[in-house]
Amino acid sequence: MVMTQYGYKGAVRKFGTEATNAVTKELTQVHNREAFSPQDAGSLSYEPRRRALESIMHVKHKRDDSKKARLCADGRKQRLTMRKDETTSPTVCTDSVFITAAIEAPENRRTAVVDLPGAYLSANMDDEEEVLMVMRGDLAEMMALAAPEVYRKYVAITPEGKKVLYVKLCKALYGCLKSACFSTASYGATYTPKTSS
């Protein structure tokens, strides 16, 4: 079985409480890692609210039948304000991984897979630019439930009656254009490749 990814609402329709539990776990991790700080929607002017990135919650149905949620930012708005060379990261291309694996397998080479849990959430955002993100509807409410003492008072109601929560990103969140750069810089400072003599 291949991993299948769903949007938040589709995952809740298909998996019910399993999806809700996965989302709650992800939001709790994001809160515990201090990935963002809540902002008072009433004090934000039109321009910062307009530039705020939309939040996206994905839920993956993994091969072991577990569900894994991932909170992302929709970084498309950032493309309008950044040059391509500002967002280029020295991370590996997915195609390169598969090509290398296709060569290594028949040659019986040793390989290793390394997973850095919450890798992006370990990297700080750049202080040069304030990045705001907005969480809407159920996601805003679930974030408030994850840590009511922190987020509840910042959940605002729009004129249409929808809940919104504006947050300032403090950590590199998946989906932001510079997140891979920040993550690579964060781990690159502590990682030293082992060389053979």
Model region roles, listed by residue range:
Residues 1-197:
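Long, low-complexity, charge-biased intrinsically disordered regions
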